[in-house]
Curated annotation (Swiss-Prot):
The keyword Plastid does not apply. The modification Phosphothreonine is found at T13. Residues 59-140, 169-272 form a coiled coil. This is SH3 domain-binding protein 5-like. The lineage of its organism: Eukaryota, Metazoa, Chordata, Craniata, Vertebrata. Keywords: Coiled coil, Guanine-nucleotide releasing factor, Phosphoprotein.
């Protein structure tokens, strides 16, 4: 059986076992609730106060997600854009090098056959314009036919009841007539445009035929060069379209990023405005009253002091209206003076405000008589209500 040893504090510890050190003067600490999953090392992490947790707007998380998504998309698309531009420049350099090599082998026949291939390019463009003009003309003709059918229906509705003119059908007829006129103008415009581009296309085709007859030998010798050039041109156009599409994607992602950032700024401004609205316009606490001897404003007059001032003002008014009479009781004057001093002491922040006051008035009741004589103005009237106090301790 293990031998037990007596240790301070009344506990027994078996021999050979360690016992915890006992600090008698140690003050027990209140348990601190740990955050779930945070561990003991998270005490240095910043924690939100309850007020900040209440004021967190759920839109912040949503806008932050939009911001992160836009940022990731910008990074990815910019990498793709850099690769596409690099590929475009590489293909452009290779095509220029191969074309220069091919041109050095063929010689002057390339320059002789160049007008023919240029005329072919213009003829192809004119043919495409002719097709577009034909589509516009067909669309205008369809609109014109639909407008004429609408006019026909409106006329039938108007003529259905000959004895009464329906304003609804009349309005529909006027609207359909306007549509017919607009469609007719569009049809005529499309017809003239189609005729113009058709003439240009015919002229381009005629020029191609003429150059083909004139430059038959040079065209045959330079055909490999221009075919290779057409292949490279098509490849470059495809890569250029890809670069343009990636640039548009980057611009759209940056627009979304700026919108999310602007929304976060607006939310932050709204939160700060709400916080400023919750705070009181003036700091809380007792208001500082006017010092002794200063003219008290209407807002500085307290409830406790109004009764004393009213009593004193009434005494002054009675003294001035009745003229010289018997002196008031000494006990009454002393009581009024003591109340005045007590009120002044309550209104002041410290006794330092009482320094420098006049010593001509004491607590023996001379104050009321002196003030009653000095309150009379040049016109014989007496100022009532507010008065200036001068007290010495």
């Amino acid at each position: 059986m293990a031998e037990l040893r007596q240790v301070p504090g009344g506990r027994e510890t078996p021999q050979g076992e360690l016992r915890p050190e006992v600090v008698e003067d140690e003050v027990p600490r209140s348990p601190v609730a740990e955050e779930p999953g945070g561990g003991g090392s998270s005490s240095s992490e910043a924690k939100l106060s309850p007020r900040e947790e209440e004021e967190l707007d759920p839109r912040i998380q949503e806008e932050l997600e939009h911001l992160n998504q836009a940022s990731e998309e910008i990074n990815q698309v910019e990498l793709q854009l850099d690769e596409a531009r690099t590929t475009y420049r590489r293909i452009l350099q290779e095509s220029a090098r191969k074309l220069n090599t091919q041109g050095s082998h063929l010689g002057s026949c390339i320059e002789k056959a160049r007008p023919y291939y240029e005329a072919r390019r213009l003829a192809k463009e004119a043919q495409q314009e002719t097709q577009k003009a034909a589509l516009r003309y067909e669309r205008a003709v369809s609109m014109h036919n639909a407008a004429r059918e609408m006019v026909l229906v409106a006329e039938q509705g108007v003529m259905a009841d000959k004895n009464r003119l329906d304003p609804t059908w009349q309005e529909m007829l006027n609207h359909a007539t306007c549509k017919v006129n607009e469609a007719e103008e569009e049809r005529l415009r499309g017809e003239r445009e189609h005729q113009r581009v058709t003439r240009l296309c015919q002229q381009a085709e005629a020029r191609v035929q003429a150059l083909q007859k004139t430059l038959r030998r040079a065209i045959g010798k330079s055909r490999p060069y221009f075919e290779l050039k057409a292949q490279f041109s098509q490849i470059l156009e495809e890569h250029k379209a890809k670069v343009t599409e990636l640039e548009q994607q980057v611009a759209q992602a940056k627009t979304r990023y700026s919108v999310a950032l602007r929304n976060l700024e607006q939310i932050s401004e709204q939160i700060h405005a709400r916080r400023r609205g919750d705070l009181p316009p003036h700091p809380l606490g007792p208001r500082r009253s006017s010092p002794v001897g200063a003219e008290a404003g209407p807002e500085d007059t307290g409830d406790g002091d109004s009764g004393i001032e009213g009593a004193e003002g009434a005494g002054l008014e009675e003294g001035s209206s009745l003229g010289p009479g018997p002196a008031p009781d000494t006990d009454t004057l002393s009581l009024l003076s003591l109340r005045t001093v007590a009120s002044d002491l309550q209104k002041c922040d410290s006794v330092e405000h009482l320094r420098g006051l006049s010593d001509h008035v004491s607590l023996d009741g001379q104050e009321l008589g002196t003030r009653s004589g000095g309150r009379r103005g040049s016109d014989g009237g007496v100022r009532g209500g507010r008065h200036q106090r001068s007290v010495s301790l």
